[in-house]
Amino acid sequence: MAELLTLARPYAKAAFAYASEQGATDNWSTALQVLSAAVQDEAFSAYLNRPELTPSEQVELFAKILGEDQSQAVSNFLTLLADNDRLILLPEIAEEYEELKSQNNNVVDVVIESAFPLSAEQEQLLKTALEKRYNSSVTISVEVKPALIAGVVIRAGDQVIDDSALNKLEKMRTRLLA
């Protein structure tokens, strides 16, 4: 997964730079989300990866999916990906693109994993603390993961803050076995 993100990052940066320059970040965002969903569909992906399909035929398939929403720039981008056998990276490119878009809008997307559901008050306290820490607006999504036993794991981009009981037990286990 990390390797795919590494490969996808330059494509996402180039797409975002172009879209920003053209004032079309939302249009590109929509197109990349649709294309990402298409590539993740097993039947479509199997058809797309048939050896007899040329890169231009692959791009034509995407043109049919996007319909009138496909600009010439998106078509050129897809051609570049198809020519380099990188269409499989579309989900990662879309993810990286959205990350760049959030950074540009000074918004940090945060995923909070908690052993138990958080109350609205707890969510608000965490949101306020994270906005202060990152000095920007924060959007929070909460996932309940009972395996954590207690505590939370906070993920913001590449940063992870793990204050879960599971993590603390693992650290104790490592120390005892060392």
From Swiss-Prot:
Task: Give the stretches traversing the membrane.
Answer: none
State the compartments where it is located: Cell inner membrane
Q: Which UniProt keywords apply?
A: ATP synthesis, Cell inner membrane, Cell membrane, CF(1), Hydrogen ion transport, Ion transport, Membrane, Transport
Its membrane topology, per UniProt? Peripheral membrane protein
Chief subcellular location: membrane
Please provide an example of a Pfam family that matches this protein in its UniProt record: OSCP
User: GO MF terms on file?
Assistant: proton-transporting ATP synthase activity, rotational mechanism
Q: Which GO terms describe its cellular component?
A: plasma membrane; proton-transporting ATP synthase complex
Q: What does this protein do?
A: F(1)F(0) ATP synthase produces ATP from ADP in the presence of a proton or sodium gradient. F-type ATPases consist of two structural domains, F(1) containing the extramembraneous catalytic core and F(0) containing the membrane proton channel, linked together by a central stalk and a peripheral stalk. During catalysis, ATP synthesis in the catalytic domain of F(1) is coupled via a rotary mechanism of the central stalk subunits to proton translocation. This protein is part of the stalk that links CF(0) to CF(1). It either transmits conformational changes from CF(0) to CF(1) or is implicated in proton conduction.
Q: How does it assemble?
A: F-type ATPases have 2 components, F(1) - the catalytic core - and F(0) - the membrane proton channel. F(1) has five subunits: alpha(3), beta(3), gamma(1), delta(1), epsilon(1). F(0) has three main subunits: a(1), b(2) and c(10-14). The alpha and beta chains form an alternating ring which encloses part of the gamma chain. F(1) is attached to F(0) by a central stalk formed by the gamma and epsilon chains, while a peripheral stalk is formed by the delta and b chains.
Q: Which HAMAP family match?
A: ATP_synth_delta_bact
| Similarity section | Belongs to the ATPase delta chain family.
Query: What is the protein's name according to its record?
Result: ATP synthase subunit delta
What is the protein's species of origin?
A: Acinetobacter baylyi (strain ATCC 33305 / BD413 / ADP1)
Q: Which gene encodes it?
A: atpH
